[in-house]
Curated annotation (Swiss-Prot):
Species per Swiss-Prot/TrEMBL record: Homo sapiens
Gene Ontology process terms (BP): arachidonate metabolic process; establishment of skin barrier; fatty acid oxidation; hepoxilin biosynthetic process; leukotriene A4 metabolic process; linoleic acid metabolic process; lipid metabolic process; lipid oxidation
Keyword GTP-binding recorded: no
Name of the protein in question: Polyunsaturated fatty acid lipoxygenase ALOX12
Sequence positions bearing Phosphoserine: S246
Cross-referenced InterPro entries: LipOase, LipOase_C, LipOase_C_sf, LipOase_CS, LipOase_Fe_BS, LipOase_mml, PLAT/LH2_dom, PLAT/LH2_dom_sf
Amino acid sequence: MGRYRIRVATGAWLFSGSYNRVQLWLVGTRGEAELELQLRPARGEEEEFDHDVAEDLGLLQFVRLRKHHWLVDDAWFCDRITVQGPGACAEVAFPCYRWVQGEDILSLPEGTARLPGDNALDMFQKHREKELKDRQQIYCWATWKEGLPLTIAADRKDDLPPNMRFHEEKRLDFEWTLKAGALEMALKRVYTLLSSWNCLEDFDQIFWGQKSALAEKVRQCWQDDELFSYQFLNGANPMLLRRSTSLPSRLVLPSGMEELQAQLEKELQNGSLFEADFILLDGIPANVIRGEKQYLAAPLVMLKMEPNGKLQPMVIQIQPPNPSSPTPTLFLPSDPPLAWLLAKSWVRNSDFQLHEIQYHLLNTHLVAEVIAVATMRCLPGLHPIFKFLIPHIRYTMEINTRARTQLISDGGIFDKAVSTGGGGHVQLLRRAAAQLTYCSLCPPDDLADRGLLGLPGALYAHDALRLWEIIARYVEGIVHLFYQRDDIVKGDPELQAWCREITEVGLCQAQDRGFPVSFQSQSQLCHFLTMCVFTCTAQHAAINQGQLDWYAWVPNAPCTMRMPPPTTKEDVTMATVMGSLPDVRQACLQMAISWHLSRRQPDMVPLGHHKEKYFSGPKPKAVLNQFRTDLEKLEKEITARNEQLDWPYEYLKPSCIENSVTI
């Protein structure tokens, strides 16, 4: 006879406990024991009890549990179960971290990560095969729109598997803040009913409520050329700027601009010429909002790097050449102030479109969802890469499902306020998806390709590279615990299936764009996993968090333009500028959604600080602790740097980076 001490931990979320009774079994290498005790798990509690077992169970392999219900199935969120065997046996952990529903028996394997084996009689092998078979029935792929990455098969949030849903606190906060934003928007519209909307200062009428200190600075400085240029490096969208290697063919200089031609060529030769080309927007149909046509452009901006490391704009071409306009008007800083301001506003509007659709929605949200669905379909809970990745896919499926039903859906926010809404955003997504490459998701490759390595003022680039290095060391630490040689990587069928699922299925045959279809070495696996974690954490933070700072003052990044782009400079008046920028309704909606999507989440989990313990044993824990130490060091470095800056760059401070895409 032996005495076992069992601890059952229940989640701390609302409604995690259950009034239903839970039955437990212990399963070891030598036998199985049904525990007579039945418990009613309480929210946030760890219940402990001892039980005598008549036979020697040997090494514990599984805990089985079954929730009995009478009349009502009261779901239970089980964190984990730990068991201490007779004598001096070490405590054994059985991680769960999922909802227990219905009356089926749930088997929890001991938490040691295990690679797949080829022994069909192995209980763990049978368990992982059954788990994957069940999961592949639950987590199915769907096509939201042709030509885009696949998504989870869920038309609405209630269709999602329970374990991918928001916890109750998150749901309540998300829905309450939507209502709070709508109320503030309504109050602002009422406030402006009897007011004029004729000059830029009139935007002050709605610039109250939900904003940030940085947004206030943007309001004061947004017309400055230096701040306009700064945003290409460190604003809401630092992903478009690149160093010029030649003068763009679309930049047609008319006669009389020989001096500008010489200046551009000089900067090009010095390696100090940069460009931001929005050609992806060319030909995208513009929205029609409440019967009024909106407008889009595809600008090109040429900038130079001053000796002090600051960018300055040199010329803006709002539209590319076309048969009806072979030599489009070029706008210069020396032009009449309102004409130059309107040209910059067109650039900022175009940047808003690419930022939200290409770099935010596609490159972080949709890529993260592909990683999440493939992980649930291909990697069982015992797999070390599942244990490693699962904290980084929390809430991603629900936030994306909500986006498809509220933000980019027919009649959603984009249709109501954004110039690419009404279907243009889907066409833009398709174009961007066709250009999505593996290298573009990896900062060392992307920044090198764009010629931005080593720029002293490129704060996003600096912080992204530092984080990539830290995440890469973390990945390598975990991978080398389980894959000591390249042949072990090549011989893991679950891992290889996961790779194919992402590239060939989720990303729709993306091998032509550099994504791998198999892993042949430790280093190849580590690079891919680093991309996965970076995309789901740091990159999303860099792209998401700046929305309130840079978009709350609407003239700095107008969500739509209501008049065609100017073709002459002399005719631009304040009426032209105000007639082009968003109206009161659109501006209020932009402010509300910018706050809702980029505010700090109340249940935010910082990068690397998840509480779930999926791994067992000291070695994975040591790797995670070193990761946290490295992040703390970077936090101090960024904090010290930012204290010396007029415009601190906070988005990649580790404490500001969420552990997954949750908003």
